[in-house]
Amino acid sequence: MKKIYFAGSIRGGRDDKDLYAEIIEKLKKYGEVLTEHLGDKTLSVMGEYVKKSDFIYNRDIEWLKTADIVISEVTNPSLGVGYELAYAEKLNIPVVCLYRPSADKKLSAMIEGNKNFNVFEYQKVQDLDEFFIKIFN
């Protein structure tokens, strides 16, 4: 069973929390989602209230180190997600970036221009079904 690290914005904005929950449910068909809490609709932009930042950092780095693949939703820019992607790249962990193009949300050149990242553009969560079958099988 694959260990999947899902990355998405928390403190950078929770506008996509419902989408994250749907993506995480789809990913669970292919393995253990280490960061399943990102789909928690009660998680606010303040993050995990009871946990200190250093605890969250250390825990997430440990999860990253054990991951077989990183799947990230990068439409909503996030410093934390960018850091996680760079860390995963340094560890030679495959990175997939899911992105919904729109007139007001442009993908960072640091993501789009990185040949080590697999960027997949989509519009609806249903568009991910075939893509996930392809990358996990």
Whereabouts are the PLM-identified features?
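Conserved catalytic or regulatory cores that recognize and/or transform ribose-phosphate-containing ligands
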Residues: 1-137
